[in-house]
Regions:
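Right-handed parallel beta-helix/beta-solenoid
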Residues: 17-32
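Fungal secretory targeting signals
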Residues: 1-20
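Extracellular beta-strand-rich solenoid/capping regions of secreted or surface-exposed proteins
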Residues: 29-39, 50-67, 73-93, 104-130, ...
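Right-handed parallel beta-helix
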Residues: 63, 68-70, 89-99, 130-141, ...
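Extracellular beta-rich repeat passengers
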Residues: 46, 249-363
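Short glycine/acidic-rich loop motifs that flank beta-strands on beta-rich extracellular proteins
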Residues: 52-55, 76-81, 104-107, 122, ...
Length: 363
């Protein structure tokens, strides 16, 4: 009998240890983050609030699987952020159907975005490698840029929903969906972005694929180069946008370079293919080499040439009094070897404007 009692005690103690081990790998308070991340490789994140001015740092061990299962919200402070920072090699980050990452952007929005003295934080920074996967993630109301991807190599983001539609009426500005820099072999697919700025914006990177996206509102599928001082950091190479829908956006396709003779770089081997447009209000295709945050200068430079630009099967509708199907403004020597085909867009209210003519398209 005594031996039997000891056996049951052992079983109960073992079960308790197992339960404690499981519980210790669940984050349900901000104070638990560091200990769980350092000890566990299978992590569940439940609901809690991140204190004002703090970054939720999920710097994961290699091979970790992290699952968002609750609602994460962030307290208000005027600062640069990011509010969340996910980092790791060979990691899987996923969400259940019940989770939400709520940036509470309505607390910061003022109709000025990043163009005044009121600081607004980026919602999330991702730095990952080793075939890491981020899937089924739901994000709401980013104060400024939603997702920044930097220093990442060989990662996939899929089945994301970024819902910033509240910003349409509450002053959301510069709420880019995904910004990419210093990265290669990044894929973003099967995702929806509702926002007030670029759906995708590539600042620097190579071997990037964006497919099966639905971008609503915002400013389109963009490449923006010239932000940095070095040639390498102003170079974008081998980027493909395909099989996507742009709906009620300002632009559909937008390539923009900053005219600064001291900043060199290049944009090469870019493909836009099979893009559907619905109600685009300004430009179906806009390539400009005179872009600044304060607006277009009207004086393009070829300091960052756009080469080997392939655009095919762009179709759909535009609406409104400012709609232009194609706008091209190249600096001297700034555009070469463009091949366009099957540009079938209706509803433009204004004529095309081009100072460079692509092969296969007549302005």
């Amino acid at each position: 009998m005594k031996a039997l009692q000891l056996f049951f005690v052992f079983i109960l103690c073992s079960t308790a240890r197992a339960l404690n081990a499981t519980a210790s790998c669940t984050i349900d308070r901000y104070e638990h983050v560091d200990s769980v991340v350092s000890q566990c490789k299978s992590i569940t994140v439940e609901s809690f609030a991140v204190p004002a001015g703090q970054t939720l740092k999920l710097h994961l061990q290699a091979g970790t699987t992290l699952t968002f299962n609750g609602n994460i919200a962030f307290a208000y402070k005027e600062w640069d952020g990011p509010l969340m920072w996910i980092k790791g090699n060979g990691i899987t980050v996923q969400g259940t159907n019940s989770h939400l990452i709520n940036g509470r952007g309505e607390l910061w929005w003022d109709g000025h975005g990043g163009h005044n003295n009121k600081k607004k934080p980026q919602l999330m920074m991702i730095q990952a490698s080793g075939n890491s996967v981020f899937k089924n993630i739901k994000v709401k109301n980013c104060p400024l840029t939603c997702i920044g991807i930097s220093d990442s190599h060989g990662i996939t983001l899929q089945q994301w929903t970024i819902d910033n539609k509240d910003g349409d009426t509450k002053g959301g500005i510069n709420t880019d969906g995904f910004d990419i820099a210093r990265s290669d072999k990044v894929t973003i697919k099967d995702s929806t972005v509702i926002n007030q700025d670029d759906c995708i914006c590539v600042n620097q990177g190579q071997h990037l694929l964006f497919t099966n996206l639905h971008c609503i509102g915002g400013h389109g599928l963009s490449i923006a180069a010239g932000l940095y001082s070095t040639y390498e950091m102003n170079t974008v190479y081998n980027v493909t946008f395909t099989n996507s829908i742009l709906e009620n956006s300002r632009n559909a396709i937008h390539i923009k370079t900053i005219p600064d003779a001291n900043k060199k770089g290049e944009i090469t081997s870019i493909t836009y293919d099979n893009i559907k447009l619905i109600g685009i209000s300004f430009y179906a295709i806009n390539v400009q080499e005179d872009y600044t945050n304060d607006g277009s200068t009207g004086h393009p430079l070829g300091n960052i040439p756009v080469k080997d630009l392939k655009i095919n099967n762009i179709y759909g509708t535009m609406s409104g009094p400012y709609a232009v199907k194609v706008y091209i403004l190249c600096g001297s020597g700034g555009c070469s070897n463009w091949k366009w085909s099957n540009i079938n867009v209706s509803g433009a209210a204004r004529s095309n404007s081009c100072n460079f003519t692509p092969n296969g398209f007549s302005c």
